[in-house]
From Swiss-Prot:
Top-level lineage group: Bacteria
InterPro entries: GAF-like_dom_sf, HrcA, HrcA_C, WH-like_DNA-bd_sf, WH_DNA-bd_sf, WHTH_transcript_rep_HrcA_IDD
Lineage: Bacteria, Pseudomonadati, Thermodesulfobacteriota, Syntrophobacteria, Syntrophobacterales
Single GO MF annotation: DNA binding
Name the record gives this protein: Heat-inducible transcription repressor HrcA
Family: Belongs to the HrcA family.
Function in brief: Negative regulator of class I heat shock genes (grpE-dnaK-dnaJ and groELS operons). Prevents heat-shock induction of these operons.
Keyword check for Amino-acid biosynthesis: no
Entries under HAMAP family matching the protein: HrcA
Transmembrane residue ranges: none
Amino acid sequence: MSDLSKRDQHVLEAVVTDYIHTGEPVGSRTISKRYGVNVSSATIRNVMADLEEMGFLHQPHTSAGRIPTERGLRFYLDSIMQFKALEEREREMIREAFRNELPDVKELLRRTSRVLSRFCRQAGVVLWPKLTLTLFKRIEFIRLRAHQIMVLLVSKTGLVHHTLVEWEQDIGQEELDKYSRYLNDLLEDMPLGEVKQRVLEEMRDEKVLFDQLYSRALKITDRVFQQNLESSDVYIEGRTNLLNNPEFADVDRMRRILDAFEDKSRIIRLLDRTLRNSTGVQIILGTENDLQELNEISLISSPYRRGDTLLGVMGVIGPLRMDYSRIIPVVEFTADLLSQLLEEPGED
């Protein structure tokens, strides 16, 4: 990133701040009047011209003013912006939104997406936790009918994965209960991402090879883990908030945005990318996300956890012209609060 002088940074900050609040191109006189830049309008115009030449600002042909480019926004976010600390009143309002008792993890995550949407006035998104990132709590086998078994895989976090298994032999419920007890002892507290390998190792054990109970229990479990436990879902709340942004008033642009939200896999791919770097708030601007359908929006995201275990990611999607200094602290606080609330379900 280019080095900018203090004056250059001051002018860039003024342009970004004004553009975020108004959505309109910013002129030198506006900067001179509103932002206390103690130089003439002519000097400010020269600085803005230099910033445009360096790729930080852009001048729409219909206007004498300028707007920040993605590069300008990125420099502002990384080097200039100062967060607005949440007031205690705002923190309490967010806490209050979670105060009613929530029946399960699913409803807690859905509530989180609503809270983000409401407080940030954009789209709130929460990526459903990946089972493979959580710890094993128990497995249950339920005989539904001859040759058909329902397998319930439960994580320490309270997530439940259902799998229907068609089995060659008919197995009674009493024997299935023995399978559960054996596997619950074997796999206790193991990361679910490691269970498949542990089952394969156990299947090669000599004593297991000659024990029908152990062998059959492991084979059924192996079949469960051959399915895709990596699959994700995402809760999205407040799509219509995006349409209130003037950037999306254009019908074609609005249709592209709504189509992108309709296909959840695109949003999941965007959120999955942020899981690779699982510490703190991340911001992905426009074309940085590699998904052409989403290159007109920004994502502000933060991971959420249960204890030391990373579960997923949540955040806010909006236009490039979001009030980052206000929204980032909301996302950060809500992620911390969600992580605290997730300590409660799934305890032994």
